[in-house]
Structures are given as structure tokens and as C-alpha cells.
Amino acid sequence: DFVEKSGERWYYLKMDVEKFFYRMDHEVLMSIIRKKIGDKEAVRFLEHYVCHASRAFGLPLGVKSPLEISDKEMLWDVGIAIGGGLSHMYGNMYLNPMDQMAKRKEGIQYYIRYMDDVIILSTDKELLHRYKNMFSDFLGDVLKLRLNNKTAIRPVSHGMEFVGYTIRPFDVRLRKSTSLRMKRHLKTIQELYRDYEIDLDRARSTLMSYKALMDHCDCRALEKKIFEDFVLTHNPKEADTENG
């Protein structure tokens, strides 16, 4: 709201780290962990998870997906397993030095980060260009990462894509890709319930989690359509088999 009410032309810098989880450097990560955690047993446990995994998770620079290369070409000294609570914890710890530089050294007021997605707001477009170059150098020199081609500076009025939403001064909507992914997942949930592979509580909790996602944006028509289409039925043949 403050952007809309200010009457000024606002811009945003959207920074996205290239293949973040696949490119996290093990030495850099463990150095950060050792500075933050004093318990040696805990550090050894975390180091085992990071440095002694049963398989390699690192991608060479320029490779977009693990599907593009063989297991032998995956890198052992970078990358961590995605999923579970530890990967998100590692991700936040890894980029904390960047947060500290932004807030404490540079004093950037409108700095927002969720994992490797970063938004900075300003009325000064040239300042955002300076920030872009500064963070690009910091990521490369200190964290051994680089920004991808989604990194851009645009007017806020054009809409910012962030954490599954398109955010404008006057409204917030689900990104089209988020909406399509949600519809596909809910269709899968219906199929799993129909075939007795999940129970009612699981199906209902999935639907309600998406309702919470939609509650934060302007998509009442979409929400109404989702609830109308989400009908749970059991496969009659499966029911007959169970009764027999």
C-alpha cells in the first residue's frame, strides 16, 4: 500500500540465485556453520550430512537439471539434498552473510528474501543497478554463487513475481504457473483418494493448504471454481472388493 500511496515511481530489483541448492559450496557452508554453532557433536553431524552424502548432488555451472548429465558427472564438493527441514535451514544460513551486508552494512530498508529469491524496492533505479552489481560480486567472491538470467530491474507497476504470486501495488494474484501446478496436484489428490491410496484427512488438508495460499491474494473466482470442482469419490470396484 505504501508504494501506491507514495505517489512516486517505484522500482524493484529481483535477484534469483542460479541453481542455489545444487551449487552451495560445502567449504563455505561448513565455515558458516562453525561460526554459528559451538557444539562440536552437532557440527560433526551437520558436516556428515553435507560432505559425506551417499551420492553427489552438485551441478556443474551451466547445467540446468540433474537429468541433463550422468550421475558420474555430478559434483561432490557442491550441492545438498533438497527436501526436509535441513535443506531450508542450510539455505538460510548460507545466505545470511548477504542479509547482514544488506541490512547492517548497506542499510537497505526494503530488502526481502525467501530462500534464494530476493526483492529490493527503491525509487532510485540507478541505486538498484549498483545493488545488483554489488550483490553479484559478493555472491561470486564470498559465497561462490551467481545470479541467473531471471535477475531484473523493473517498475513495481509491472508486477513482481515472488513466492508464487504476482504482486502489484493494487492487487496480488497467483502466478499462472502456481495456479496450474495447484490444479494438477488437486487432480492427483482426487485420483489417489478414489483409489484408496490416501484418506479423507490427507485430501482435505491438501485442499485447505491451497485455500490458505489463495486467501493471501485476489482470486475469489478461482477459489470458488477449485472448491466446486474438488469432489471426492471412491472407486466402486475397490469398494466392492473391500466389502467382499
Language model features with spans:
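Prokaryotic Sec-type signal peptides and long signal-anchor helices
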Residues: 24, 49, 139-142, 234
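A common structural junction motif
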Residues: 37, 136-144
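Residues within well-ordered alpha helices
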Residues: 32, 138-139, 159
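Right-hand nucleic-acid polymerase module
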Residues: 67-77, 129-130, 147-244
